[in-house]
Regions:
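Short, intrinsically disordered terminal tails adjacent to the first/last structured region
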Residues: 1, 206-215
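Hydrophobic, aromatic-enriched alpha-helical segments typical of multi-pass transmembrane helices
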Residues: 2-204
């Protein structure tokens, strides 16, 4: 019981630390634009605030890991929980395999660097994998709830479906103009869903204090 509630707190703290790290690191870099530059540039190889950037990415990974545990503990989900766990692993990959920004984070997303290598390829694959795992987790909750056989509430299925559509639409905008802005809105969408799931999964039944089951 306590571990599940604690997981919800860790998820919230992880998301807060992620955004604090992103905002703090961005302010410290001259010329960095939240509208035009990727978040991962802050953690890039060549970034003067790489430590803060990496810390932010790891905080996001911790939030996903905690939510995975909350879902597994509350609902015994053998599909959704592993998918969120996989998203946590993908987030960790982004922190470990950092993109090359030899001239620093500012403008890194807008310039083609000759130092692009296999590490950058792994980083890009990690971004794609993260989105796929999160989308799959959202759709798993949606399908399970709408079929009426899930331990989580039906409304969470509808909410997850809306967030899945938003995630897919927003991530498609992260390779055009104002990539930094779109990436932030996309991640805000995904992390908001994550916190909703963590919150619902850690709700207590007032009768016995156990995880509340909605089925």
């Amino acid at each position: 019981m306590t571990r599940s509630v604690g997981a919800g707190g860790v998820a919230l703290l992880g998301v807060m630390l992620f955004w604090a790290g992103v905002l703090g690191a961005g302010v410290l870099v001259s010329g960095y634009s939240a509208r035009e530059d990727y978040i991962s540039s802050l953690a890039g190889r060549g970034s003067q605030v790489a430590l803060l950037g990496v810390g932010a990415l790891l905080a996001s990974a911790a939030a996903h890991l905690a939510t995975s545990w909350a879902v597994l503990t509350a609902w015994r989900s053998r599909v959704c929980a592993p998918l969120i766990f996989a998203a946590a692993v993908a987030s960790t990959v982004l922190a470990v395999f950092r993109q090359s920004c030899p001239d620093g984070p500012a403008g890194c997303a807008r310039t083609d660097t000759p130092d692009d290598d296999w590490v950058d390829a792994v980083h890009r694959a990690g971004v794609g994998a993260y989105e796929l795992f999160v989308l799959a987790a959202m759709l798993t909750l949606a399908v399970g709830a709408l079929r009426g056989r899930a331990a989580w509430p039906r409304w969470l299925g509808v909410v997850s479906l809306v967030f899945a559509a938003g995630s897919l639409l927003l991530v498609s905008q992260t390779s055009g103009e104002q990539v930094g802005l779109w990436q932030r809105i996309w991640l805000a969408n995904n992390l908001a869903w994550l916190l909703i799931v963590a919150g619902v999964a850690t709700m207590r039944d007032p009768a016995d204090g156990r995880p509340h089951r909605f089925s």
